[in-house]
């Protein structure tokens, strides 16, 4: 996996970030999404794109806080399958408003070669907020968020079993 940031360049002269990910048949999403038709969820690619934009903001020292996607558009024109080799991400910064703590950006995701673009991410907007602005307690999350992991595991296994039964009867 590679990660690269640069300020003051890119499509709009404001900066860009690139990243890549080596796909493995052992990646966790392939065994459950979808049974008998494995594919990486499109939302996984979208989330990685948004994470890369947030990383650019932090690495550039321009915007800080908890990032939240505010708006955006995207188009999927392909899939990432278990035999895909590598995913390439690119984020181009359109502009950032430091006082308003907002980032505008676009980009794409390609599979196997940087030229094989399968997801287009049009104009996106991301805001950066403090814990107080989001009404998040100012203490470690373990003090206010304590999920019942055993129940979560039971529910996940039930879902997998029900999915297997469903596909066996198709």
List PLM regions with ranges.
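Single-stranded nucleic-acid-binding OB-fold domains
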Residues: 8, 96-103
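Segments adjacent to and within acyl-thioester-processing domains across lipid
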Residues: 116-170
């Amino acid at each position: 996996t590679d990660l690269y940031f640069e300020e003051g360049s890119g499509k709009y002269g404001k900066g860009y970030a690139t990243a890549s990910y080596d796909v493995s048949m052992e990646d966790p999403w392939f065994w459950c999404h979808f049974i008998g038709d494995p594919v990486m969820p499109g939302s996984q690619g979208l989330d990685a794109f948004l994470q890369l934009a947030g990383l650019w903001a932090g690495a550039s020292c321009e915007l800080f806080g908890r990032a939240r996607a505010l708006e955006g558009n995207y188009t999927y024109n392909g899939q990432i399958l278990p035999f895909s080799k590598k995913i390439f991400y690119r984020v181009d910064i359109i502009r950032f408003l430091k006082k308003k703590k907002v980032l505008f950006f676009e980009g794409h995701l390609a599979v196997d070669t940087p030229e094989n673009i399968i997801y287009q991410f049009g104009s996106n907007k991301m805001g950066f907020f403090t814990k107080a602005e989001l009404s998040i307690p100012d203490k470690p999350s373990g003090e206010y968020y304590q999920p019942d992991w055993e129940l979560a595991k039971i529910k996940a296994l039930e879902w997998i079993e029900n999915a297997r039964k469903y596909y066996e009867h198709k």
